[in-house]
Design a protein with these regions (language model features):
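N-terminal glycine-/serine-/threonine-rich phosphate-binding loop
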Residues: 1-76
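Structural motif
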Residues: 2-5, 31-34, 63-66, 79-81, ...
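Short acidic/glycine-rich loops and adjacent helix/strand connectors
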Residues: 5-6, 10, 22, 29, ...
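Active-site histidine-anchored catalytic micro-motif
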Residues: 27-28, 43-47, 60-62, 66-69, ...
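A conserved acidic, glycine/proline-rich C-terminal tail/linker
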Residues: 182-265
Length: 276
């Protein structure tokens, strides 16, 4: 049985995400719905792409992913049903799929046209739910529109390599719920460019000279527990998705702040790694 996932910028205050689930239950009965996130920053396509890219691979092939971010149809933006990496994605052609498909080519891109006469301010319920239900029942996406060969392009920022100064100049691409700062510097790039040289990571006025393998590596287990002072320690590591992440060990953003607020870092801010 397929899984239907939801990734939106609806938040949890309003009725929007509940309405989508209600419409899916109304169409399909006892369907398995998973919320990936409803807290994408409003209309932030790049943030939504980061979240869904790092989540969808954990679901079984054949899963259906509804992407409700900047989803309204207009003369410059149609709706899509895309099969990619064995999964189905239903979204607007707003560039989000180009960010997901920059590593894997889509198997099929369908421009949805069965709703051309429908004027809606809530496309996720009025259109996306119906397409998801069609796919869930075993219907072909070829029946919901016409095939197209390309996607609207949206380009993410990539790290700059300076061979002369031996630097990687990267950027913040995501800040999570713990205020951990995720950069666009991959572990592969770090290893290939750095070639095991010593390094220094610079994030505004903060410097890191070590990359740990896990959050708990910040703990001095050789010190008696009562004397440890690791809470609040700044750490750098490559996260599960192999991107360089800056963090503060066990910080609570609601009380003392996390890496983003304490380091003064936000989306697109520069992080550099200088090799010696």
């Amino acid at each position: 049985m397929s899984v239907i996932t939801l990734t939106t910028d609806f938040g949890v205050k309003d009725h929007y995400s509940g309405s989508v689930k209600g419409a899916l239950f109304n169409e399909l009965g006892n369907v398995n719905i998973v919320d990936i996130s409803h807290n994408v920053s409003p209309f932030n396509i790049i943030e939504a792409a980061y979240i869904i890219e790092n989540a969808y691979k954990n679901f079984p092939e054949g899963s259906i992913h509804i992407l409700g971010v900047d989803s309204e149809k207009n003369p410059e933006q149609n709706h899509l049903a895309v099969k990619l990496d064995g999964h189905y994605f239903i979204c607007a052609d707003n560039g989000i799929m180009s960010l997901l498909s920059n590593k894997i080519n889509p198997e099929k891109i369908i421009e949805i046209n069965i709703h051309n006469d429908v004027i809606s301010t809530f496309s996720v319920v009025d259109v996306f739910v119906k397409i998801a239900a069609h796919i869930y029942r075993g219907g072909s996406i070829d029946l919901v529109g016409k095939q197209k060969d390309n996607l609207k392009e949206l380009y993410n920022i990539n790290p700059i390599l300076n061979e002369k100064t031996k630097e990687i100049i990267g950027n913040v691409i995501y800040v999570d719920n713990y205020e951990n700062v995720v950069t666009n510097i991959s572990k592969k790039l770090f290893q290939e460019f750095g070639k095991s040289q010593s390094f220094e990571i610079n994030a505004r006025n903060y410097k890191f000279k070590e990359i740990v393998k896990s959050y708990s590596q910040a703990i001095r287990f050789d010190v008696v527990k009562e004397n440890r002072k690791e809470i609040g320690k700044k750490i750098a590591l490559f996260n599960k998705n192999n991107y360089l992440e800056l963090s503060i060990y066990k910080s609570n953003p609601l009380i003392s702040g996390g890496a983003s607020s304490l380091f003064g870092l936000d989306y697109r801010d520069i992080i550099t790694i200088k090799f010696k």
